[in-house]
Amino acid sequence: MGLIIKGKPVADAISETLIKEVDNFKIQGIIPKLVIIRVGAKASDLAYEKGILKRCNGIGIETYVKEFPEDISQREFIRELRRLNEDRNVDGIMVFRPLPKHLDENIIKYVITPEKDIDCFNPINLAKVIAGDSTGFAPCTPRAVMEILKYYNIDVEGKFSVVIGRSMIVGKPMSMLLLNENSTVTTCHSKTVHLDKICSQADILVAGIGKAEFIDSKYIKEGAVVIDVGINVDKYGKLCGDVDIKSCQWKNVIVTPVPGGVGTVTSSVLAQHVVEACKHKNKL
């Protein structure tokens, strides 16, 4: 019988620690501040924003949203981003991506200052992830995966890990974080041949393929740990992940659900990054 491990206990544990830290900051007259930059009003962005606001406000982090119209020019967007870079009261900046096509992310990602880039938009932070430099900010979703593994005492050292997906937001940094913890990592993608055979050898499988319930029992070996980072909608219109949990319920596996898994932890990790940025700025 499979074991489902949920994200809420992980998120709550992170938040509990952060609340104590922020309370200590306030005694010194310091209040961490996050600014969310959102262009337009996509449903997925609004849902994520709601979760961030709830989590950060509960911790004691001042959180503000800067909403821009979808037709904002690149020049104006960059000007606003630079203002936030220069604002000493702002500790963290979160840019919701992807941006509209007329806003060139390959240019904008170099504008955000790395010290405030709490979701690894600037390549400098990605380079730090690759180098195993803890002073950089990893993307929140891969970091949330690592927090889940840590909370449930799942050791990755020496294990064979397979990451499905090679995006800059999840797949590539996820592979690096696992590698930094001495896991042996294989990264798979849409062109990978014999995907099921590779996945079925994994001790730890991180699924970020972006296909609803695509990963079934033939991709998962007995005793594997399966972390589902997919967010999809099934044929009934319900939120689901990349893993078909029902198909592997009779296997001896550990799996995270969707919803209620990695996504639950992501907003707490983001808050953690804001607090870390605040500590760095104030030399705490």
Curated annotation (Swiss-Prot):
One of its GO terms (biological process) is purine nucleotide biosynthetic process. One of its GO terms (molecular function) is methylenetetrahydrofolate dehydrogenase (NADP+) activity. Transmembrane segments: none annotated. Keywords: Amino-acid biosynthesis, Histidine biosynthesis, Hydrolase, Methionine biosynthesis, Multifunctional enzyme, NADP, One-carbon metabolism, Oxidoreductase, Purine biosynthesis. Signal peptide: none annotated. Its EC number is 1.5.1.5, 3.5.4.9. It holds the Pfam family THF_DHG_CYH. Pathway: One-carbon metabolism; tetrahydrofolate interconversion. Catalyzes the oxidation of 5,10-methylenetetrahydrofolate to 5,10-methenyltetrahydrofolate and then the hydrolysis of 5,10-methenyltetrahydrofolate to 10-formyltetrahydrofolate. This is Bifunctional protein FolD. It comes from Clostridium kluyveri (strain ATCC 8527 / DSM 555 / NBRC 12016 / NCIMB 10680 / K1). The lineage of its organism: Bacteria, Bacillati, Bacillota, Clostridia, Eubacteriales.
